[in-house]
Amino acid sequence: MKQLWLTLILGAAITTTAHSQGSAKPDSSSADPYLWLEDVHSDRAMQWVEKQNAITAKRFVQTPTFDALRDSVLEVLDSDARIPYPSRMGEYLYNFWRDKEHPRGVWRRTSLEEYSKPSPKWDVILDIDALGKAEGKQWVYRGAQCLQPKYERCLVSLSPDGGDAVAVREFDIPSRSFVKGGFQLDVAKSNVSWIDENTLYVGTDFGPGSMTESSYPRIAKRWVRGTPLSAAKTIYEGKPTDMTVSAYHTRTPGFERDFLSVVKDFYHSETYLLTSDQRKRIEIPDDAEMSVHREWLLIQPRSPWTVGGKSYPAGVLLASSFDGFMGGARDFTVLFQPDDHTSLASYSWTRHHLILDVLDDVKSRLEVLTPSRGEWKREPMAGAPGLSTIRVVETDPDSSDEYWLDVTGYLTPSTLERGVIGEGKAKSVKEAPAFFDASRFEVSQHFATSDDGTRVPYFQVSPKGMAADGNNPTLLYGYGGFEISLLPGYSGTVGRSWLARGGVYVVANIRGGGEYGPRWHEAALKANRPRAYQDFAAVARDLVKRGVTSPAHLGAEGGSNGGLLMGNMLTMYPQLFGAIVCEVPLLDMKRYTHLSAGASWMAEYGDPDKPEEWAFIKTFSPYQNVKQGESYPPILFYTATSDDRVGPVQARKMAARMEAMGYDKVWFYENTEGGHGAAADNKQSAFMRTLSSEFLWSQLR
């Protein structure tokens, strides 16, 4: 179940109230002179933001090349030739689409027969631009949950500013209208799940004390149609220190079940089976992921697990009968066993089969498993070309063995394939266009050696015949956290804004990520966080050693946790880089748990309010470690006022502190919309991508 709430929290769906970005009021008596910037919407803070934006725009936006490059990037984002990735609900394929005519987007659907045509006809379900115009709101679509099996009634999530907080409104597809007097939630970080057409599970801001310290719902309730939210029956009430609580119902015919998830922190949770008169704990390790499909329970522990007289390693995937497990049986079939080179990236059910997505030294391959009483039948599925990625993008687990695959690489535009297990090889349905001349470039994989001897993989995209003279403008990208893997994939925006200019693009698969499973991630947790930074620095040094670039021509970029990575590159390894772009970052690790959703990440970084943990956290807190009189490279911070996940204040304070120290190559830009993605539509995304590219190219060429 972790995959669900991790997607919601790290993605953009589960959603404090809109005013809760600076969740803890700063203590004005503190020694920090920039706490006033934590008052997100204050006149003083916004005046500072406007001044900074004007300075940055004058330097990097008002240039001879900016408009043309921005328009070129926007052309990629708005292209009608992009693949409209489908989401199957019943007989229809649904898609959310943004383009030049619909900057906020349209939610639409079509049939499989129509979708297979080069230019399918779409039936628009909801036009977000038209809705916003009619209501005088700048709505940003955040998804919809539709009630099985008819998929006619949906709970649509709409953000007023692109942040995680959303309004939830019941929508009727046949009439193309919101349901008068239907289910509706005000803007908040909420989770909702259909039980039946007249009942929901709901977690939201029910009033003071109803949210966790991490700013997510603390209470799960059962809400009946026609009754006020205040009358909803409490199912479970978590602790303020829990990360979030949610209840949900699965509607697979013959296997209807109700579950309660109590997430303790990012990597520990408890899941319960709910019945009419009790809740029963599913007795798996609290750090394990689990999922249920029909009669099957799948378990993936994050640490070694000894049970039933057998021991299983971290990252293994185990299968058991759900009813048997709940009855006390501990008989498992091992579906995936990791080794030093492999990890399980994900898995997806069809009606009768399980598809495994396996990473082998960060290169993907698929396997199809068929359940049986003993060992499951296992067959390989056609894999991706070399140095590419193949992934499952959609299945129909309740009704058929249909599956959809996306095949892509750094120089290979995506191909969308559809297949049915047992009916031969998947066939190409859609192909994305090429947005730059890939024939000029080549992709290679390399391994750097980190300080402790660990081999760290990285991908390099560079011009063919590139001179190894150290003079090539090079952009090194990284993340290194939350077990997120950075895999090969085509980006027309990177191609046009960086590669086409002659730049080299590098992606580092550092520890903290998920490229080698839980062990790779846990190697950089808490006190070991500096290993991620050592890995990134090792890749930078290896690029210089191989003659790809030199510090004066090497730039680094990362966002969110990757923004923290960038902050530490600035303070720990300034001599390695010629420029840094730090996006929507964490930087003040002393106060991060009191800002926005920061308390939810203590399992990743530690709790700075505990002296014994602050002792190691302070070693990687850039805001505290930036010093006067150092030779720091030029840096661009960018963020969004509406970011209610990390918030804009850490970037603000870091920029203000550095400027006060006398650094004159510190640049800051804050978009008002967009949430943690710093952009609410394609036009804003194109602007931010171009701003980053113009900054880097001006410093590194």
Can you name each region flagged by the protein language model?
Residues 7-13, 18-402, 406-423, 438, ...:
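Beta-propeller folds
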Residues 494, 501, 507-701:
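Active-site-proximal cap/loop segments of hydrolase catalytic domains
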